[in-house]
Amino acid sequence: MSLDLPPPPARGCRSTEVLKERGQREVFCGLTGIIWLHRKMQDAFFLVVGSRTCAHLLQSAAGVMIFAEPRFGTAVLEEKDLAGLADANAELDREVDRLLARRPDIRQLFLVGSCPSEVIKLDLHRAAERLSAHHGPAVRVYNFSGSGIETTFTQGEDACLASIVPTLPATEARELLLVGALPDVVEDQAVSLLTQLGIGPVRCLPAHHAAEAPGVGPNTVFALVQPFLGDTHGALTRRGARHIAAPFPFGEEGTTLWLKAIADEFGVSAETFEAVTAAPRARARKAVAAASEGLRGKSVFFLPDSQLEPSLARFLTRECGMSAVEVGTPFLHRGILGPDLDLLAEGPVLSEGQDVERQLDRVRAARPDLTVCGLGLANPLEAEGFTTKWAIELVFTPVHFYEQAGDLAGLFSRPVRRRAILRREAAE
């Protein structure tokens, strides 16, 4: 069976030399991942051990007032804690006791490290073990770091899921595990497609509730739905699970190849695959063509932000007719992103890490039609006449799989259309 996809480029970017940048950074810290994780994991609570700045970041980013009692909060480190004049561990134990007494619905508690807790070397791993022993088995306490010293934007989710993997029950069952947090409606679409293909059981990490936690073992195969899960990938591999490598499910091509890799693993026939995917593929292709009309022939420059950049560059160049000038990403995990890099035609600079001033110099020299960057860089670049796209929108907006393919293309085409309208109005 032919998948009716464009042929791969004669030479991809998997072996392209990577420009390593190690300078000033401009990116959100890993605490930001709590915003989508607390909505996904419905019996979990995320307790950040940090400063008032951490609390303000979370409250502002989530758009949730504290009196609404969301499933996250901050244990604020005061000056006496930072100065070593108080027993931070004893105070943390008291705060956790009060929290669990007030919120008996909590089954998973995450102690999340921040810049202040890292600076004073507060051992949250040991604290989590101590609190798990005290409050278990009703409540399991985990810990991970969302510190800006150690993590960037999307690494918070990776650190969270990696902390869960060692505690997952062992199983010998042959199961497919989908790894990465997705909006519920998108996750349902993915599971529905896989079920129609006859693949199952399908389990998800993270699960909605602790009682639904998947097992993992030597017969577990897993597919990542987010490209920033390097630590989670390693943790699952150490438990004996095997990764199904594939391009990520962005756009019609990425979704089809992602599904095809899983279908091949489970022996799905070509006829069944075609019958299940033909209609949604056609819808996705039509939607992308309509939404990307203003993108064809234009150039794009990715500044590092979320680790989605190589996959999105593949989508824009292969399905939307754009050319990539530079694809910057905080970390480049070739074992995970290799299939996407194979489909990204050689030519663009691949950069890993960040040196803001050097990268901005390259943006100014290249004059791309669209620059994908963080919030802090967008307005200054717009003031210089560049068209920008906020990278954070690509994480917070549903963009995976067939039904969201047109929306994904639209996220990139809207700023280009807006700039064109403003230029016409200025000319008049």
Curated annotation (Swiss-Prot):
Cofactor(s) this protein cannot do without: [4Fe-4S] cluster
Pfam families from the UniProt entry? Oxidored_nitro (PF00148)
Q: Does the keyword Nucleotide-binding feature in the UniProt annotation?
A: yes
- Tell me which UniProt keywords the record has, alphabetically: 4Fe-4S, ATP-binding, Bacteriochlorophyll biosynthesis, Chlorophyll biosynthesis, Iron, Iron-sulfur, Metal-binding, Nucleotide-binding, Oxidoreductase, Photosynthesis
One MF term from GO for this chain? oxidoreductase activity, acting on iron-sulfur proteins as donors
Question: What HAMAP family is this protein classified in?
Answer: ChlN_BchN
Give the UniProt family note.
Answer: Belongs to the BchN/ChlN family.
Its recorded name reads Light-independent protochlorophyllide reductase subunit N
